[in-house]
Amino acid sequence: MGRGRRRRGAGVTVDAASEHSRTRPTPRPLPDPEILAFLYLEARLADEGRYSEWESLWADDDDTVEYRVPMHPDDDPRTTLAYINDNRRRIKSRVAQLNTGNRHSQTPPSVMRRIVSNSEVVAEDADTVTVESNFALFEYRIRQRFWAGRVIHTIRRSADGLRLIRKVVHLVDAGGPVETLAFLI
């Protein structure tokens, strides 16, 4: 075998020089502590059923706000159905409904705890930061359920503090049978 060439199982020969010249992945930046604290607050308020406080984290401009749980990560929200596809008005309506306590699918109410981890900044400009995180949500209502996936938060920095303008939740088991999402995921 020639110099600089190496045999790799099943008769496959790889040029050793090109094998080492491949682009290595680089870590994404971590969110700053203020952004992480905001993500943890959003998760805690949802877990504790503090719906009005959770809603207050959202920006007020209806044309940019999006809360979505697609059936598939590549789905176009304009042309496909989603488990949740809310604008700002719909978020307000969802929270008002949750606050009544009159949801058959939440009687008794779920007890929830979620873990948000592996958070990475995927985009940032002067006013906004987009963070992707893994999440695991443990829900107990009559029996235990487990929800997991990747969540994308876009947060705007403003004079009145941080405001959520986009939350997209990609469930691991999206596309399959999903029980009711009668809570904030």
Locate the predicted segments by residue.
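A general secondary-structure boundary signal
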Residues: 31-34, 55-58, 63-66, 127, ...
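Short, low-complexity N-terminal intrinsically disordered segments enriched in polar/charged residues
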Residues: 2-52, 56-57
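A beta-strand edge to alpha-helix "cap/lid" segment located at domain peripheries
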Residues: 14-19, 111-113, 120-185
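Hydrophobic pocket/interface hotspot
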Residues: 42, 54, 91, 131, ...
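Short helix-to-loop capping/linker segments positioned immediately adjacent to catalytic or ligand/cofactor-binding
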Residues: 42-43, 102-109, 141-143
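A solvent-exposed, acidic/Ser-Thr-rich amphipathic alpha-helical stretch
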Residues: 60-131
